[in-house]
Regions:
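Short, tandemly repeated low-complexity microdomains enriched for cysteine and small residues
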Residues: 69-72, 212-214
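Alpha-helical protein-protein interaction scaffolds
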Residues: 171-224
């Protein structure tokens, strides 16, 4: 989760706080753009900074774009931030739209005569798919993981971990729910966007920025 709620540094480049009113954003845009315009600023980074100022203003001046940026900044950082203009929702294992997806974390064990290896995987699926995948993984673990005592013990741990994972709700799921809420809205599927935003809201424990952003997003979906 982004620590400062500004994954791409748009608020930073305009020198405004994340809760800045539109009037301040406009004021800072004109001031910063004038200062960094490459026609009269000899700084070697002037072109890059001026372009970023323009991109930042284009996002933050629009209520809906700004809200989407703020939500995605909760779950992405600068290095993995997605293209907001080409955001696609995650779908179930059959490649279909699904309003009840979760991230399933599983532990896979493979034994050898000299020991064993284990790795954790993450899959996006619905509840029914998750149960089937856990059973399938458990069978595979038993077939691959019975050759040594240490692997057998690790398999018991993996079995418990995998079955508990079906019901897990954590940061990975919050990321999935936010992503799909924004992606479905961008794809004009407000029904799915609303459901995912509501589910994400249930995972927010405190009355902080996350809850405020999600409630605003849901209100906009309800209004339109």
């Amino acid at each position: 989760m982004s620590a400062n709620f500004d994954a791409k540094g748009y608020y930073q480049v305009l020198e405004v706080p994340p809760n800045a009113p539109l009037s301040l954003i406009k004021q800072q845009y004109y001031s910063r753009a004038k200062f960094w315009h490459p026609d009269h600023n000899d700084n070697p980074d002037a072109v890059e900074i001026f372009q970023k100022i323009s991109v930042a203003y284009n996002i933050l001046k629009d209520q809906k774009k700004r809200l989407k940026y703020d939500l995605l900044s909760l779950i992405y950082n600068n290095h993995d931030f997605p293209d907001m203009e080409a955001l696609n929702p995650y779908k179930n294992q059959s490649g279909k739209d699904d309003a009840a997806l979760r991230v399933l974390k599983q532990r896979r064990v493979t034994a050898f005569f000299s020991g064993f290896t284990k790795k954790e995987t993450k899959d996006i699926c619905n509840y029914a798919e998750a149960k089937d995948m856990v059973v399938s993984t458990s069978v595979a673990n038993w077939l691959k993981g019975w050759w040594s005592l240490s692997a057998f013990i690790e398999n018991i741990k993996a079995l418990k971990f995998n079955y508990n994972a079906v019901q897990a709700a954590d940061e990975d799921n919050f990321k999935l729910l936010i992503h799909n809420a924004v992606a479905y809205e961008s794809n004009n599927r407000k029904d799915f966007a609303w459901v995912y935003a509501k589910q994400a809201l249930l995972l927010v424990k405190s009355n902080g920025r996350e809850k405020k952003l999600l409630r605003t997003f849901i209100d906009i979906l309800d209004y339109h």
